[in-house]
From Swiss-Prot:
Subcellular localization, as worded in the UniProt entry: Membrane
Signal peptide: 1-26
Protein name (Swiss-Prot/TrEMBL): MANSC domain-containing protein 1
Membrane topology annotation: Single-pass type I membrane protein
Bias-annotated ranges (Polar residues): 248-261
Lineage of origin: Eukaryota, Metazoa, Chordata, Craniata, Vertebrata
Sequence segments annotated as region (Disordered): 234-277, 352-372
Pfam families: MANEC (PF07502)
Tissue expression: Widely expressed.
Glycosylated residues (UniProt): 72, 222, 251, 327, 352
Single GO cellular component term: Golgi apparatus
PANTHER family the record matches: LOW-DENSITY LIPOPROTEIN RECEPTOR-RELATED PROTEIN 11, MANSC DOMAIN CONTAINING 1
Location, primary (coarse class): membrane
SMART domains per the UniProt record, alphabetical: MANEC
Amino acid sequence: MFFGGEGSLTYTLVIICFLTLRLSASQNCLKKSLEDVVIDIQSSLSKGIRGNEPVYTSTQEDCINSCCSTKNISGDKACNLMIFDTRKTARQPNCYLFFCPNEEACPLKPAKGLMSYRIITDFPSLTRNLPSQELPQEDSLLHGQFSQAVTPLAHHHTDYSKPTDISWRDTLSQKFGSSDHLEKLFKMDEASAQLLAYKEKGHSQSSQFSSDQEIAHLLPENVSALPATVAVASPHTTSATPKPATLLPTNASVTPSGTSQPQLATTAPPVTTVTSQPPTTLISTVFTRAAATLQAMATTAVLTTTFQAPTDSKGSLETIPFTEISNLTLNTGNVYNPTALSMSNVESSTMNKTASWEGREASPGSSSQGSVPENQYGLPFEKWLLIGSLLFGVLFLVIGLVLLGRILSESLRRKRYSRLDYLINGIYVDI
């Protein structure tokens, strides 16, 4: 009876010692859980990863404790990475123990049903110098490979990392400092990420605002009026006076047709038409049976104005809506008959302004120069479009002819029949 009680007491003491060792090992073993990830074996074997044969453990804690107590991987290597397979049942090996020489030697990839744990206590640190921010050694140990501020791989794997163990913060605070320091590290990481996102957002908004400003500045500069037309197009309201600047004879009239196609959502420019009145001061230019077409293309509006001169015996009369211009010459590439407009010096006392430009003078040279690149770039595009359409048409025609010829050749080819064919045909005829 005494020996039986002594044996049971010894057995109880052994169990208590074993449980104490396991509890102490699990408490001193600092770990980081990574859910639904597994080691990329193909790329890790060439980087020095080592492992033992898989063993069976009933729970994840047993597998973690086994990794913490294993010091003989490939001789004298300590386990610092373990994977627990939750899909294995019926006492199948589900605990995999590995030794990683450094963080880069063990890249991970997503895998459902697998729990990976890094043993941070014995895991060698890897310090990186980033161009945007520099993290201390404690921060690199804290975040490991899956931190967004330490390694580029973190950006791809942070979606799979879900830390489940909270008890490691106390141990880490005992090793690296107080909990306040850890909170500062966490806040610094989050603040830096938010600052980068805010800077990126602000940069996009500033670039958009600058582009809007450029478009707004281009609006008054690129709007050009045609000096050889009667219709005046301007972003400001123009008022017609009872006595226009240029007066036409009663037997001649000019009908301008202006078509504005704004590319942006802007207000349509007003058009002021000058009517004919009895001439008081003859200030006009005489065109001899000529028709000219001017195209003014701007970034904000496309103004196409076509004017024709009536076939009168005295010729057509055209007016210029400017007051003080001595000599004006239009040279455009699209006009077949270049027209030179010459005017005599006009005294301001004998004229009234028809349109008020408010400090803006239209430049015909700029409109002609602006239309040249459009034509230069527009013609090759249309040319290549026509060539491509022609090639596709020819290709489809050739394919159709080939298929048609094949069908015709097969229909005209005489089929050779064997004796069996004749026998079968005779049987069908008899039936």
